[in-house]
């Protein structure tokens, strides 16, 4: 079930530098929201806070779902949220095992795990590489693997931090197609950062401009 996330006056400081300054915004469930802004405006910091990997210095986050109201910020909620970084980390093992990692630690049964990973490898265009060592993938293929690893656990909130930066056009187009297909299902709330204005317009009408640690336009 997709999540709605409301940010209430979020502030964050690093080494006496104010990164986020009283930021408030609501990301509605099932939408694809694109965060834009210059380097250092706080986009990546905001995603880490949304992923519950960091705490704000001030303000609070409210997660909710239709028919369930506000949700407690516990381990159960954390497992419904995934963050994909600009450069995905892969481990020494097959592409299949890399994608299956999140299902394994959640104790998903073998048959279900095999089925879900198989579908995700097809979705990400990595079906013919399932037995290949993930360390041998190109940067673009590794990025697709990372998104597949995030999606296979069926998250309710997917956070994508510059998912197509520094990869070739072919893999960028494949990842954009994946995001558009996810968007059509409405089953996952997506928040993504990008510097590419054209890409932002291709992926969503919900464009959010950050400046000086705040939302300046949406």
Task: For each feature predicted by the language model, list its residue ranges.
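Helix-to-loop junction immediately C-terminal to a conserved catalytic motif
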Residues: 51
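Conserved catalytic motifs of ABC-family nucleotide-binding domains
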Residues: 154
């Amino acid at each position: 079930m997709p999540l709605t996330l409301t940010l209430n006056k979020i502030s964050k400081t690093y080494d006496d530098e104010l990164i986020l300054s009283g930021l408030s915004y609501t990301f509605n469930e099932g939408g694809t929201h694109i965060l834009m802004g210059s380097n250092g405006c706080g986009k990546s910091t905001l995603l880490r806070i949304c992923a519950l990997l960091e705490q704000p210095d001030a303000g609070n986050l409210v997660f909710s779902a239709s028919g369930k109201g506000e949700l407690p910020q516990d381990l159960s909620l954390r497992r419904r949220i995934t963050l994909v970084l600009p450069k995905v980390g892969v481990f020494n093992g097959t592409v299949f095992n890399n994608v299956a990692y999140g299902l394994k630690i959640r104790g998903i049964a073998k048959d279900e795990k095999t089925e879900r990973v198989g579908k995700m490898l097809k979705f990400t265009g990595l079906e013919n590489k399932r037995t290949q060592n993930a360390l041998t993938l190109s940067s673009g293929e590794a990025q697709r693997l990372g998104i597949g690893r995030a999606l296979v656990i069926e998250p309710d909130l997917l956070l994508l931090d510059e998912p197509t930066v520094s990869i070739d056009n072919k893999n960028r187009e494949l990842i954009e197609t994946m995001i558009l297909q996810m968007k059509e299902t409405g089953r996952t709330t997506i928040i993504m950062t990008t510097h590419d204005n054209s890409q932002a317009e291709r992926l969503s009408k919900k464009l959010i401009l950050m400046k000086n640690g705040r939302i300046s336009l949406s």
